[in-house]
A protein has these predicted regions:
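Metal-dependent nuclease catalytic cores that hydrolyze phosphodiester bonds in DNA/RNA
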Residues: 1-138
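Short, mixed charged/polar active-site loops
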Residues: 136-138, 151, 244-247
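Conserved catalytic cores of phosphodiester-cleaving nucleases, focusing on short active-site segments
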Residues: 80, 139-165, 172-178, 199
Length: 272
């Protein structure tokens, strides 16, 4: 069975006879957090006299939000491509005193990414495509390193901020994710933590001899030269490329109990 990813449409498919409906890890996690209703929020913001969007039409607000989203996506794609390109310039790299081969992603001439053999040898895997057929669950980890019997995963994030707590209401109560992970605050750091933990779970399922090691988020912040009319940053460019201001590391725990609960929920609720 070959599992593939098509960038256009962001589609995962396989050539097996089971006709699996694949679910990406990010989409799966999205099931357990409140959905953002952009149209409803734009309408509300337009009428709120204390909002910076007051007096603008719903369409103008939505267009401003979409422009900012596309700007952020562009920065994220640039950084991911830059890191992958830099890594693939080498055949090997030293990690924890060991010289490891760099394993390149399998991409066809048509730009389709093919998932590799899931039994992993010691090495560094940029943009590793992982999947678990039994669940129909798949995803792509920015950087996986298999070294000294451990699975180390790093993911790059370029969004404006990393929030460590959910929204706090006037009673001091923070918003939570949905059951079965309603013990976690609904914030993007916890979303990322679950994402990396599920990647680790999938890899370990195929490689039971390995232990789960470091799970790291690299949060990349870019320099800005000012802000636009809506208060969004205008990125500083140097020689035609975004200028990086800071990279902050978040070392995250493996959320074993939460992942086990999510996997159990998925098995019970998965629609094949």
């Amino acid at each position: 069975m070959a599992v593939i990813f098509k960038e256009e449409g962001h589609v995962y498919e396989s050539n097996d006879q089971d006709k699996i409906n694949w679910t990406s890890v990010t989409s799966f996690i999205g099931m357990f957090k409140p959905k953002f209703d952009a149209k409803a929020q734009a309408k509300k913001s337009s009428k709120n006299k204390r909002s910076k969007w007051h007096g603008m039409t719903d369409k103008e607000i939505l267009n401003a939000w979409d422009t900012e989203t596309q700007r952020a996506i562009g920065l994220g794609n640039w950084y991911h491509n830059q890191r992958e390109s830099d890594m693939l310039d080498f055949e090997t790299i030293a990690r924890e005193g060991v010289e490891l081969p760099i394993v390149k992603p399998d991409i066809t001439d048509e730009g389709v990414k093919v998932a590799p053999e899931q039994k992993l040898k010691d090495g560094v895997y940029p943009e590793l495509f992982v999947y678990l057929k039994s669940l129909g669950l798949c995803g792509q980890a920015d950087l996986v390193e298999i070294v000294n019997g451990e699975i180390n995963i790093t993911d790059y994030k370029t969004n404006k901020e990393v929030k460590e707590k959910g929204f706090t209401n006037w009673e001091g109560i923070t918003s939570k994710m949905f059951n079965p992970v309603n013990n976690l605050d609904d914030c993007n750091l916890n979303h990322y933590n679950l994402q990396l933990s599920i990647y680790a779970y999938i890899i370990k399922k195929h490689n039971p001899r390995l232990k789960i090691g470091k799970l790291v988020i690299q949060h990349v912040k870019f320099q800005k030269v000012g802000e636009n009319d809506h208060g969004y940053p205008i990125t500083k460019m140097v020689n035609g490329e975004p200028a990086i201001e800071e990279i902050k590391m978040y070392n995250l725990p493996y959320l074993k109990d939460e992942v086990d609960n999510l996997i159990m929920w998925f098995k019970d609720n998965k629609k094949c």
